[in-house]
Amino acid sequence: MTDSFQRNHAYKRNGEIFDVSLFPKGMHRVALGIEYNGSLFHGFQSQVSGIATVQKTLESALTFICNEPIALVCAGRTDTGVHATNQVVHFDTHARRQEKAWLRGANAKIDDGVSIRWAQVVSPLFHSRFSARARTYRYIIYNTRTPSALMKNLVTWDRRRFHLDDMIEGSRSLLGAHNFHAFSGADCQAKTSIWRMAAIIVNTLGAFIVI
């Protein structure tokens, strides 16, 4: 291994690893599958103002049980009000725990609105963002004349009549590869802005339209 390779690929905590030998001894990479109610947080990413975010809540709990500062990397950041059922995150730590201990310990310290569904010690080569092969999003429309008080923060309500066949037909133009640069933020770190939409499924379930 050349000196230039080591300099260019030196270990950065939680960063992308290209050679296992560069991962510090005694360090472990842990992946988590998390679920959260986005209506209780101002998005995923920590913010300078200190307002409640998913990342801040999780890092606080993990820092406590690991007894060292923990920083998370997620597969993809979400905005205020966006929920997740299986968001993947990872972190590096010196702490050694059984996988069930990560679940019980962290969930006992996490605030309401966030839950860790699974935990797994993974290879240092794994990266929650760059190892992701695909992402799945679900949009739910509650299509009735009046809104629901119980589901206000869980679904989108719209009283207008939707034509399912037209929605399916229109969605076909979104399939395939597209350049999403216009939707990228100024600090976007993605390696490319071209992504492929593999499938769009539109179904109804009673008064719900699920996309």
Per-region residue spans from a language model:
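Structured-RNA-binding interfaces characteristic of tRNA pseudouridine synthases
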Residues: 3-211
